[in-house]
Amino acid sequence: MALTVEQKAEILKEHGRKENDTGSPEVQVALLSANINGLQDHFKGHKKDHHSRRGLIRMVNQRRKLLDYLAKKDRTRYLQLIEKLGLRR
């Protein structure tokens, strides 16, 4: 469910603009996407876990807001990111 330190470091290295970049929208969206994918797998076996589902919805909304921000500020970075992550928008 939660990402390990190694998984986070791999995402930072792959999507970061600099070495220790944790604040750029690309990194934040990639981390949220990894968490969302983990929670979706969790719900396949725990259908009635509504408490975690609330957290999932919150993460999806946060990712949507960050993607909207990135699309408004820099359309090319936005298009590259959704293609790299395989998001449909």
Swiss-Prot record:
Main function: One of the primary rRNA binding proteins, it binds directly to 16S rRNA where it helps nucleate assembly of the platform of the 30S subunit by binding and bridging several RNA helices of the 16S rRNA.
Record keywords, A-Z: Ribonucleoprotein, Ribosomal protein, RNA-binding, rRNA-binding
GO MF entries: rRNA binding; structural constituent of ribosome
One GO CC annotation: cytosolic small ribosomal subunit
InterPro entries cross-referenced by the UniProt entry: Ribosomal_uS15, Ribosomal_uS15_bac-type, uS15_NS1_RNA-bd_sf
Protein name: Small ribosomal subunit protein uS15
Chain's gene name: rpsO
Domain of life: Bacteria
